[in-house]
């Protein structure tokens, strides 16, 4: 039996796009014809899933015996050694399909963690012959002091290509419980991740100083950038994106004091609907210039194709609110308009409700910070 590792991009893509039993059967038969142990291992797992009673128990035993005999070839000797550590599951959560890794989540479980490093676990998982079809990777905090994501990102970058990856979440942590967003100072490069995963469908990045270069990708359907300070060049990249498959976009802009820059003019291409023909949900939120965003969106070309809009968590209190109130016909086709966590006055809330009815979500509204003498300050919800 040859070492595991035979690759067939066409069959792998078929499973990634539609993991039906028939697709798996064809794939495992091909692997078996190549002498790859995952062919026999996969066919045993398929047969077990169809079996019942004593036959199922027998196949379960056969699989355990097969894994014991061929574990190094199936999973890699170094990963098997690492998995013997009782603490491995504290840093790595792995789901599988017929034994092959399907989803992976890695993170440091506690502040003073001294067990297996999450980045080490991820590196060994990614090198494993069982990792060839991984669909989803979630990267949490690699360290707590200082908070770090980059070590996990570096592992993915070293992989060079992840052709079957469909979903990537960098920054899978709870804030502020685990850390503040602004404390993540890695400056994750969204564009680099898109290059590593040519068939990615969902990219979610949470952290500070997110970098965005030329934002072009053929298959990305969902993009979420959560930050307390999106740099000006990143805003410009979002505004000029070319994402023909994108249906869901959510961007947090943040506060100037935490690195936020840019202005609504730099979003002109996006608001014109250029490069995003399938976009149905648009969240432009958590901004210091939320009024400008709201006013521009009301008069934009992209609005007509949207089903839901999220303008929450910002500083909206003036011309943006008035633009919404004055143009209900342009917004009435929406299923939902989220204006929560802004600075709408009670009077504005009542007028918005009267204009748009049940499609608008008001939620909680903030009160401006009064520095005295009529000096009112308005802040986006998440900076730090």
Residue ranges of model-derived segments:
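Alpha-helix initiation and capping sites
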Residues: 4, 20, 36-37, 52, ...
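Leucine-rich repeat
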Residues: 88-92, 96-102, 116-127, 130-135, 146-158, 160-167, 179-192, 195-202, ...
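Leucine-rich solenoid repeat modules
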Residues: 298-300, 308-309, 317-378
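Amphipathic alpha-helical scaffolding segments comprising HEAT/armadillo-like alpha-solenoid repeats
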Residues: 6-9, 41, 164-165, 202, ...
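Concave beta-strand-loop units of leucine-rich repeat
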Residues: 78-88, 102-117, 138-147, 169-183, ...
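Long, highly charged low-complexity segments
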Residues: 2-126, 130-136, 383-384
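Long, low-complexity intrinsically disordered regions
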Residues: 2-6, 12, 35, 45-49, ...
């Amino acid at each position: 039996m040859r070492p595991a590792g035979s690759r067939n991009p066409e069959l792998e893509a078929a499973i990634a796009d539609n993991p039906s039993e028939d697709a798996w059967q064809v794939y495992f038969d091909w692997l078996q014809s190549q002498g790859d142990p995952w062919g026999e291992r996969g066919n045993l797992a398929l047969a077990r899933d169809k079996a019942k009673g004593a036959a199922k128990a027998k196949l379960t035993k056969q699989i355990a015996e097969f894994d014991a005999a061929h574990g190094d070839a199936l999973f890699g000797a170094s990963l098997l050694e690492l998995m013997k550590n009782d603490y491995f599951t504290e840093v790595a959560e792995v789901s599988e399909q017929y034994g092959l890794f399907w989803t992976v989540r890695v993170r440091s479980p506690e502040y003073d963690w001294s067990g297996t490093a999450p980045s080490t676990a991820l590196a060994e998982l990614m090198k494993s012959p069982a990792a060839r079809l991984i669909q989803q990777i979630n990267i949490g905090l690699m360290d707590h002091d200082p908070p770090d994501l980059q070590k996990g990102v570096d592992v993915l970058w070293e992989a060079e290509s992840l052709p079957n990856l469909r979903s990537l979440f960098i920054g899978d942590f709870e804030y502020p419980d685990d850390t503040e967003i602004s404390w993540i100072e890695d400056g994750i490069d969204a564009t680099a991740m898109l290059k590593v995963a040519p068939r990615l469908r969902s990219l979610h990045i949470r952290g500070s100083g997110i970098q965005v270069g030329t934002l072009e990708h053929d298959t990305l359907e969902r993009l979420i950038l959560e930050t307390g300070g999106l740099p000006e060049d990143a805003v410009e990249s979002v505004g000029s994106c070319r994402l023909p498959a994108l249906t869901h976009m959510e961007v947090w802009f943040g506060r100037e004091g935490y690195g936020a820059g840019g202005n609504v003019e730099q979003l002109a291409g996006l608001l014109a609907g250029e490069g995003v023909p399938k976009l149905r949900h648009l969240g432009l939120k958590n901004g210091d210039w939320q009024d400008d965003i709201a006013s521009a969106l009301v008069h934009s070309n992209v609005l007509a194709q949207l089903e839901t809009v999220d303008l929450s968590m910002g500083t909206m209190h003036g011309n943006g609110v008035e633009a919404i109130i004055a143009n209900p016909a342009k917004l009435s086709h929406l299923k939902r308009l989220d204006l929560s966590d802004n600075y709408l006055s009670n009077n504005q809330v009542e007028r918005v409700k009267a204009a748009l009815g049940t499609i608008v979500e008001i939620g909680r509204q903030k009160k401006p910070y009064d520095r005295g003498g009529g000096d009112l300050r308005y802040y986006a919800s998440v900076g730090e």
